[in-house]
Amino acid sequence: MQVEWQPEARAELLKILDYISDRNLVAADRLSQAIEGATVTLAQHPHVYRMGRAPGTREMVVHPNYLIIYQVVDRINILSVLHARQEYP
């Protein structure tokens, strides 16, 4: 199944990676690689992750501190990348 990043989710990810890289470049690179690897798994098994708090979404824990919020339709739409302590929706 095709994975498509929504512009807002891509912007959130870049903001997170910029913040982390200012403090620890290696950690930012590891998180980036973890997210990239997770989206490959997501494409193969989109329903393996838990149901999301928002109706029609699912949540993938990529790292203990970060979640990817996505929706499965005719493709996988990545809607948001959040810190685990962040409140939503």
What are these regions (language model features)?
Residues Q2-T57:
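Basic, Lys/Arg-enriched alpha-helical interface segments
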Residues V62:
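Conserved strand-loop elements at the edges of beta-sheets that form or border functional pockets
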Residues Y66-L67, Q71-P89:
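Enriched for short, Lys/Arg-rich terminal
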Residues M1-Q2, P89:
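Absolute protein N-terminus
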